[in-house]
Amino acid sequence: MGSRPCSPSACLAPWWGQQPGGPGPAKRSRLEEPAGPESRAAPSPEDPAGTPAVDALTSMVVLDAGCALRVPLEDVDLVLELAPMSVLRVSLGGHTLIVIPEVLLSSVDECSGAQGDWSAGLEVDVFLGAHGEDVVVEQEVCASVPEIAAEEEAYEEDADSEFPELWMDSAAGSAAGLYPSARSMFSPYREGPIRGPCALAPNPSSERRSPRPIFDLEFHLLEPVPSSPLQPLPPSPSPGPHARPELPERPPCKVRRRLFQE
C-alpha cells in the first residue's frame, strides 16, 4: 500500500543500448574512425568491378573450305561454321576471335598481289575460362571483287537481252513518206525525239550473248511491208478559219461588271 511506483530513470537500459552479443561502445567508436590504407583492401576475386581492366586480346583464325572451329567452354563446346564469303566475329569475355574463310583471303591476295602467311594456328585453350553468357557472335558478309564484276556483267547482259536495239532505215522511211530521221527514236516524254548514233558500237561481251530468236538487229521500225495493204496516211490538212464557227459575245457577268466598271 505504501510503495511508490518506480521512476523512469530507474528503468533498465533502453532498447537501443548494449545487447547481448552486440558490439559495445568501444567497438562502435572504432568503426566510426576513418578507414586507413590498410582497411582499403582490394575487392574479392568474385567482384568483377574491383578487378583491374585487362586489355582485350584479338585473335584471327583462317578456316579451310568445309571445316569448322571448335572452342571448348566451361559447360559446352562452341562450334563455329562459316559461309564461303562471310567473316565471323566472336567475343568471349576479354578475348575477341575473328574467323575468316581461306577462300576470301585467297581472292583478296589475287586482287592485291600481296603474299602472306594468314594460316597461322591459334591456341583456343585461352578461352576455357570464358562464361557462356559472355559469348557474343557477329557475322559479316563479304564479297570479293571478281564476283562483283561478274554479277555486273551478267546484269548488263540481261538488260541488253530485255531491251533490244531497234534501228530505222532512213531511205525506206523517206520513200514511204514517213519521218526521214535515222538518228532519232521517239520517246513518250514531252522533250521530243532522243538523238542517238546510227551505228552499233563493238561490244566485247557480244560473243557470250545468247542468240535472239524474236528480235533481230536488221529490224526496221518504220519500213512498210510490201505485201501489206496498209499504207501510210497522207498528212491531214490544217483547219481553216471557217472551220470553227465564232461564238456570239455574251454580256459580262455581275462580278466582272462590279470589278471592272466601264
From Swiss-Prot:
It holds the Pfam family DUF2476. Residues 226-242 have a biased composition (Pro residues). InterPro entries: PRR23. Residues 253-262 have a biased composition (Basic residues). Residues 1-52, 225-262 are annotated as: Disordered. It comes from the Eukaryota. Residues 243-252 have a biased composition (Basic and acidic residues). Belongs to the PRR23 family. This is Proline-rich protein 23C. The gene is PRR23C.
